[in-house]
């Protein structure tokens, strides 16, 4: 004859079963969650990819975001004309005295323009866009490294944008530049999984925050701008990789690549070199040893445009020794990919993709390829447990 449980014991046993069931449910749910980190230096196209994810898998942009984008897009345009004006004023491009007045206004008082009444701001934008010297600039110097990439999209649309009734399209928001400060996370369902995509600022001052998100990462999506090969940024005396102060420092060998670095300028660092060194530092991080690495070699379209007039070997002399050292997009892209693979451990894999983040279908397709790899690896891992 069995021993009957008293009521308190029956209640406790039932509660334990309930807790165990809940734990099993949560464990199963956690196995379906994929944590992805989106990393890269500033202006690599990270935020554009996040916006594409929102368009493809979330609800896109709300009304408030669309209205706010009006001012951000116009500020993007004013900022672009600021840099263009500075270059024209310092060039041999012919400009009349009247044109010089407008160029100097944009070059040296762009912030004042941004603070003007809308009618005055639009009048100035519409005035500068039709200047003869601006047309000459775009004909000969449109891919100068100081010019923001998105002006190539916005300039042909200025007649539509520079009116008081303007309302941004989804395409406009995709091309809009906005510096990522802090951490932004979106979650969405993809097939049978829940994706947590975490985007952290690419500015050097923001990188110290990255370490807090390295634990439990399934995949790292690292974005590099292929078109940054002829761009430079100021070199800071402090360590660019802030987390290294508390973790194992990156070995010096990664800073001397057999593929070679760019020609150095005093006090400056090539942005492509900066991207490669940052990627290697992340890949060497102990927290991410078991993570999948997806390398987005972005802005393939802009690379092609630049290579029409710029010789890659003039910026990376080691390219002369490359197998196919012509100035083609394919050859240059393969060389750049090899820079990221330098010093790769035998058991580490990098899945590289050529991307154009401003094209929705391109990112949708590439993201699908990445997820196929990640999901298959997850299945392999779970089958071993």
Swiss-Prot record:
GO CC field: axon; cytoplasm; heterotrimeric G-protein complex; neuronal cell body; synapse
Annotated stretches, region: G1 motif: 35-48
Entry binding sites for GTP: 40-47, 174-180, 199-203, 298-301, 357
Start and end residues of each stretch annotated as G2 motif: 172-180
Residue ranges of the region described as G3 motif: 195-204
Record-annotated G-alpha domain positions: 32-385
Region (G5 motif): 355-360
Keyword Transcription: no
Spans annotated as G4 motif: 294-301
Residues anchoring lipid (S-palmitoyl cysteine): 6
PROSITE patterns hit by this protein: G_ALPHA
Annotated residues for binding of Mg(2+): 47, 180
InterPro entries, per database record: Gprotein_alpha_su (IPR001019), GproteinA_insert (IPR011025), P-loop_NTPase (IPR027417)
Keywords: GTP-binding, Lipoprotein, Magnesium, Metal-binding, Myristate, Nucleotide-binding, Palmitate, Transducer
SUPFAM superfamilies: P-loop containing nucleoside triphosphate hydrolases, Transducin (alpha subunit), insertion domain
Pfam families (UniProt xref): G-alpha (PF00503)
Molecular function terms from GO: G protein-coupled receptor binding; G-protein beta/gamma-subunit complex binding; GTP binding; GTPase activity; metal ion binding
Source domain of life: Eukaryota
Subunit record text: G proteins are composed of 3 units; alpha, beta and gamma. The alpha chain contains the guanine nucleotide binding site.
Xref: PANTHER family: GTP-BINDING PROTEIN ALPHA SUBUNIT (PTHR10218), GUANINE NUCLEOTIDE-BINDING PROTEIN ALPHA-5 SUBUNIT (PTHR10218:SF302)
Similarity field: Belongs to the G-alpha family.
Known role: Guanine nucleotide-binding proteins (G proteins) are involved as modulators or transducers in various transmembrane signaling systems.
Name recorded for this polypeptide: Guanine nucleotide-binding protein alpha-5 subunit
UniProt organism field: Caenorhabditis briggsae
Name of the encoding gene: gpa-5
């Amino acid at each position: 004859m069995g021993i009957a449980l008293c009521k308190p014991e029956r209640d406790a046993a039932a509660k334990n079963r309930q807790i165990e069931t809940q734990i099993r449910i949560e464990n199963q749910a956690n196995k379906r969650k994929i944590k992805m980190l989106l990393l890269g230096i500033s202006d690599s196209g990270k935020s554009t990819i996040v916006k594409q994810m929102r368009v493809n898998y979330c609800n896109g942009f709300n009304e408030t975001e669309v209205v706010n984008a009006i001012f951000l897009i116009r500020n993007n345009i004013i900022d672009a004309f600021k840099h263009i004006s500075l270059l024209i004023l310092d060039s041999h491009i012919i400009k009349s005295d009247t044109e010089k007045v407008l160029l100097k206004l944009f070059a040296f008082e762009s912030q004042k323009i941004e603070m003007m009444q809308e009618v005055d701001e639009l009048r100035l934008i519409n005035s500068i866009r039709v200047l003869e010297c601006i047309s000459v600039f775009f004909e000969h110097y449109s891919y100068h490294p100081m010019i923001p990439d998105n002006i190539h999209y916005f300039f042909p649309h200025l007649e539509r944008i520079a009116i008081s009734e303007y309302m941004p399209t989804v395409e406009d928001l995709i091309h809009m530049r906005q510096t990522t400060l802090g951490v932004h996370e979106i979650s969405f369902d993809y097939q049978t999984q829940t994706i947590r995509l975490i985007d952290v600022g690419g500015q050097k001052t923001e990188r110290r925050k990255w370490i807090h998100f390295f634990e439990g990462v399934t995949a790292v999506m690292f974005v590099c701008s292929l078109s940054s090969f002829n761009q430079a940024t100021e070199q800071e005396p402090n360590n660019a990789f802030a987390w290294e102060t508390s973790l194992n420092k990156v070995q010096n060998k990664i800073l001397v690549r057999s593929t070679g670095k760019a020609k150095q300028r005093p006090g400056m660092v090539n942005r492509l070199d900066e991207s490669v060194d940052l990627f290697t530092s992340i890949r060497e991080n102990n927290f991410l040893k078991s993570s999948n690495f997806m390398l987005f070699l972005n802005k393939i379209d802009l690379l092609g445009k630049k290579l029409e007039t710029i010789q890659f070997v003039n910026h990376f002399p080691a390219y002369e020794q490359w197998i196919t050292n012509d100035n083609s997009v394919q050859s240059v892209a393969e060389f750049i990919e090899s820079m990221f693979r330098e010093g790769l451990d035998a058991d580490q894999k990098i899945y590289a993709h050529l991307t154009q983040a401003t094209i929705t279908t391109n990112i949708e397709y590439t993201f699908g390829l990445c997820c196929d790899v990640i999901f298959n690896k997850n299945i392999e891992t779970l089958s071993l447990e």
